[in-house]
């Protein structure tokens, strides 16, 4: 069976990517040079009333949403599936149900059209996002990335495409997870990070002397469980019943601001240590969902300024999960001369950056 003919007006070698690692269903099409031809994201709302992401519900929602979303993105780009040169999908790390749904959908399209499939590491996609040409950043290897999201918190030296040195990571909670849990303690809506940041604008960030775990210590690891516990005990002084309905607004705002400042201080300290270990770093980058937090951005921007290097952060829409970053990560690999066809790779909830591609099904651990 021969592959369908492409339309004469199709841009050179467009790549379609799918992202379903958590609760956002996303699809994007990029041209070979990284130009964004079209993109779309559907955020699931069912989890809000449940106070967090339910993996089974998320996976089912991805399955329901993908056909229409892919069709919509193709229409925006004035393309058909036959015009797509390569398909890509997030294959890990993340929630296994969603990963299987999204990567299998992309693989199915690739197989039906006799096109290659690129298995993309979700963390790698976040790390490479600031190099997207349309962002206009003059970002060159090597650079240091502080990856801060709900599921991940890592400090990574980005040597080149496919070569990453993990300098440190969280030993307990990720920063985004801590944001969500503290927001829940304060009775805020889910997702907690944006709600907490908004409330913090009404408070004083020096109102409560919260701990800065691991600050000043050697290494680049993070720890946020102790900070989270300190916040819980502080809130209990005002609300011993745990109802969270009776918290004074100003108290809650001061707690939010103090917590946010503590996290930013820890991240800045860890970045300082990481830069000391990476004297050749050309820039400091922050990426991941929590990178949308303005206080965190400002703290890391100041660290970069202290070291005389530029600071880069993706626009807010590319900090949270999206398919543009997945498509760009796949293109970065293709630009580097790789010719992957990873149709047999298996989705997996854990996928260290040190492993080039996830294991085949019989070798998944």
Swiss-Prot record:
<feature type="binding site">
    <location>
        <position position="122"/>
    </location>
    <ligand>
        <name>Fe cation</name>
    </ligand>
</feature>
<dbReference type="Pfam" id="PF00814">
    <property type="entry name" value="TsaD"/>
</dbReference>
<comment type="similarity">
    <text>Belongs to the KAE1 / TsaD family.</text>
</comment>
<keyword id="KW-0963">Cytoplasm</keyword>
<dbReference type="InterPro" id="IPR043129">
    <property type="entry name" value="ATPase_NBD"/>
</dbReference>
<dbReference type="InterPro" id="IPR000905">
    <property type="entry name" value="Gcp-like_dom"/>
</dbReference>
<dbReference type="GO" id="GO:0005737">
    <property type="term" value="C:cytoplasm"/>
</dbReference>
<dbReference type="GO" id="GO:0002949">
    <property type="term" value="P:tRNA threonylcarbamoyladenosine modification"/>
</dbReference>
<dbReference type="GO" id="GO:0061711">
    <property type="term" value="F:N(6)-L-threonylcarbamoyladenine synthase activity"/>
</dbReference>
<keyword id="KW-0819">tRNA processing</keyword>
<feature type="binding site">
    <location>
        <position position="126"/>
    </location>
    <ligand>
        <name>Fe cation</name>
    </ligand>
</feature>
<feature type="binding site">
    <location>
        <position position="180"/>
    </location>
    <ligand>
        <name>substrate</name>
    </ligand>
</feature>
<dbReference type="GO" id="GO:0005506">
    <property type="term" value="F:iron ion binding"/>
</dbReference>
<dbReference type="InterPro" id="IPR022450">
    <property type="entry name" value="TsaD"/>
</dbReference>
<feature type="region of interest" description="Disordered">
    <location>
        <begin position="340"/>
        <end position="365"/>
    </location>
</feature>
<feature type="binding site">
    <location>
        <position position="293"/>
    </location>
    <ligand>
        <name>substrate</name>
    </ligand>
</feature>
<protein>
    <recommendedName>
        <fullName>tRNA N6-adenosine threonylcarbamoyltransferase</fullName>
        <ecNumber>2.3.1.234</ecNumber>
    </recommendedName>
</protein>
<keyword id="KW-0012">Acyltransferase</keyword>
<comment type="function">
    <text>Required for the formation of a threonylcarbamoyl group on adenosine at position 37 (t(6)A37) in tRNAs that read codons beginning with adenine. Is involved in the transfer of the threonylcarbamoyl moiety of threonylcarbamoyl-AMP (TC-AMP) to the N6 group of A37, together with TsaE and TsaB. TsaD likely plays a direct catalytic role in this reaction.</text>
</comment>
<dbReference type="InterPro" id="IPR017860">
    <property type="entry name" value="Peptidase_M22_CS"/>
</dbReference>
<feature type="binding site">
    <location>
        <position position="193"/>
    </location>
    <ligand>
        <name>substrate</name>
    </ligand>
</feature>
<feature type="binding site">
    <location>
        <begin position="147"/>
        <end position="151"/>
    </location>
    <ligand>
        <name>substrate</name>
    </ligand>
</feature>
<keyword id="KW-0408">Iron</keyword>
<feature type="binding site">
    <location>
        <position position="321"/>
    </location>
    <ligand>
        <name>Fe cation</name>
    </ligand>
</feature>
<dbReference type="InterPro" id="IPR017861">
    <property type="entry name" value="KAE1/TsaD"/>
</dbReference>
<keyword id="KW-0479">Metal-binding</keyword>
<keyword id="KW-0808">Transferase</keyword>
